[in-house]
Amino acid sequence: MRQGTLHFFLFFGLIFGFTTLSLAQHSVARKWNEATLLAIRNDFARPTVHARNLFHTSVAMYDAWAAYDLTAQTFFLGKKIGNFTCNYIGIPTNFNVPAAREEAISYAMYRLLNHRFKGSPGASKTLPYIDSLFVALGYDGSFTSSNYSAGSAAALGNYIAQQLIAFGLQDGSNERNSYANTFYQPVNSPLVTKFAGNNMENPNRWQPLSLDVFIDQSGNVIPINTPLFLSPEWGNVTPFSLKSQDLTIFTRDNNQYWVYHDPGTPPQLSPDGSGTSAAYQWNFDLVSCWSAHLDPRDGVMWDISPGGIGNTGTLPKTFEEYKDFYKVVQGGVTQTGHPINPSTGKPYAPQMVPRGDYTRVLAEFWADGPSSETPPGHWFSIANYVADHPAHQRKFKGQGEELTSLEWDVKTYFILGGAMHDAAVTAWGIKGWYDYVRPVSAIRYMGTKGQSSDNKLSHFSAQGMQLVPGLIETVQPADTLSWAKGGDLGKVKVRAWRGPNYIPNPATTYAGVGWILAEGWWPYQRPTFVSPPFAGLISGHSTFSRTGAEVLTMLTGDAYFPGGMGEFVAKKNEYLKFEEGPSMDVIMQWATYRDASDQSSLSRIWGGIHPPADDIPGRMIGEKIGKAAFAFGEQYFSKTSTPTRDGLSDFQNMAVKVYPNPISSSTNQIKLEIPTTHPVLQFELINQQGAKLRTWKMDVDQFQAGFSLHEGGRLTPGVYYLRITGDGEQLTKKVVIVE
């Protein structure tokens, strides 16, 4: 290990028995967290489900610790979470508190992990490991009592697990039915990826992919070759700290989609090229252009040290700002790097590597697998290795006395787990509602249509790709490629990663970059995976990573990794799994947690599975989630504070329905469905500037029959907020008025 740096590994390809050393070195919470990550790596690749698993296991450990603390308060025991109340009468503390905490944590985790992973495809590895850890810690699995009233720590742990299991069976995840979707249906026919072309029905909506064989991101062979959308209804799951004021409930086909932190409609491709079509084309064209950066032989060298990259400034908000922020031709974004390592007081040493090595390592490093703990688990691994660094001090927010390793771990996991769960609920709620297209579908669709730059050229289509010299062009008679003849003349060709057909052996060959037909474009992924089986907007990586970066920054009180830099070494011709490479040792380096997050975001563009339109909203929303989850979670560390649980939760959980929404500016009536016992409710219509425009007081019969938003004058199209108040409770609903 270099002095002043941190090496951490995300455990790709980790083998059974990996924590032998940690048994002697780490807290009991850390041991069980490592067991959870092992279980996730051996399970199906489900970021939503595993963010929830990490949240629930973190709550189990935190409450088992807090139950014996004189200062902290529990999160779950004795509290109401969503519609679930966990009864708790307290436990005597007149005995060995450290031992009781370890015992309660271990029993809670043992029961919960066995429940969650008993049906896992890797159960033959996971369950024996959990058993061996439990026995190694000195506990008896035959003790199943949950009667903790006499002071049994084991019984308390069993009770916590029992209650969390019951909570999970009613939290909106549909765990009881293996998390199956209950109403979502795709609008597009599947794309058979091995054949060129794409004539999908709606270029703005997600398209299933049909593969010869589907291998998920954890390396599991799935017996269906057209995977279903993962968790499109996840916005309905009970969150950690999300607020009703940030919630919009949309309706499609009489089904509700709960969306927190609504980013608004992404760019849409219109038949005539109007509206936001140009933004759509630019976004997906950029993904194709960046695919040209995946060849280490192109002669382009980059300094990938923290002095050369990182320290990204203000994120773009408008389409014009996007075009300034992202560098379409050369790749990367506007960033200044860090001139000095604050830990050493010296400049960061340059690291010059081929751009094509950096981009490929980046894409695979942050990928979800195989043998991955998924993006939410990545940030637990990062948190664990930050805690292990010799320069790290276990001071909460960087202040006060050092905490014990157990207290540091349970508090870290509690806030990080809650934040990752909120990120999953938010990102997948947005994915389900907007149902946005992935690059492989969009690029092949536009490439099949033609080009939109010059209506005097052949193959013109308002829905085609925009030409970029040297990167997106049309096939000419002088082209000598084998496919550049006959019916291919005039079609759109792109300079891009050539795809899996050019990789006969991933261990010894790589595809490189060259001219291919746009209708046959591939993302930098395995042909057995191609793209994640869920919609694009918003990027889960961007959301999870920015959320995690904000939490670790606040938790440690320092934006920088311990020692001023985190590192990961990708060995020459060993690290890459999609194809041979890298051509030299590449050291991934980050000065700050946010730098790591930003690189995670960009990795998805070079990997060909997200455009900028997915990335930036994910970063912005992730920052909001991370900060809010931290502020919410830290309140539980003191009995003198009153955690501000969503005061609107009673209304929220009644699934208030406002329809039609969006509403036409010519529509007179809007209706609400609120299963409430309040005899009279107050309604206030507020604009985006916070001005109160209308106020009504109505009983149930009135608002269910419908009332006009336009009383007192016609409202202009835009976003408004309907604040509902009754008996001291409030709920705010977003209402969109359109032409």
Q: Where in the sequence are the language-model features?
A:
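Generic low-complexity segments that are intrinsically disordered, proline-rich and/or Lys/Arg-biased
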Residues: 1-4, 8, 240, 340, ...
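Bacterial Sec-dependent N-terminal signal peptides
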Residues: 1-27
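Hydrophobic alpha-helical segments, especially transmembrane helices
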Residues: 3, 8, 53, 542, ...
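Short, intrinsically disordered/low-complexity patches at protein termini
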Residues: 3, 14-16, 463, 568-570, ...
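Generic alpha-helix initiation/capping and coil-helix boundary signal
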Residues: 10, 15-17, 150, 376, ...
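C-terminal outer-membrane/trafficking sorting elements
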Residues: 15-20, 649-659, 664-739
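Acidic/polar surface patches and capping/hinge elements
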Residues: 25-645
